Amino acid sequence: GESGSGKTTLGLAILRMIPSTGEIWVRDENLQTLKKKALKPHRKDLQIVFQDPYGSLSPRMTVNQIVGEGLRIHEPELSESEKNNKVLEAILEVGLEEQMLERYPHEFSGGQRQRISIARALVLKPKLIVMDEPTSALDVSVQAQIVDLLREVQRKYDLVYLFISHDLKVVRALAHDIVVMKEGQVVEQGPAQEIFESPSHEYTKELLTAAFM
């Protein structure tokens, strides 16, 4: 859907980062009914990568601290060396190097910062990652690299992405199923191939025409 259609709001609501009504079912549990303590185990399994690779990383923290923050919260029983090993594994997974661990976000390009954000999500071995326009702030060539990385990681760990985007070319490269939103409502949903080849809603047809004309 276009900007303002409710995509990001829906993603944040699913993660219970904003108040919402309705039901959110994960592993046979309705997250809406859970108190903070009962919700904590699910927080580990439900991660997010934000759109802005510049604003979503604390400028006062090193890469090691940023990527390892979730481990300190969700796996406090880990020793320092175990935590460091998991952080190293995560940053190598996303194509960064060990010597980058003690550097700060301002020392990196946009694409590298987004890789740090992805490593921060991956280090907890989540089941679902909400990807909130993770490539929209990047140059086209860097976008392609991040899309390739996301596909590779998804296959390796059998991850589910809720990939939020208005860029249908990126959606086509990644999505198995698509939900089209307009003004806060779902207007069409189905398998990606079906949506791209035989859209039924006029709004979906307009989006596809604009993206691929």
Give, region by region, the residue ranges found by the protein language model.
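Conserved ABC ATPase signature
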Residues: Y104-F108, Q112
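Conserved ABC transporter NBD signature motif
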Residues: G22-L31
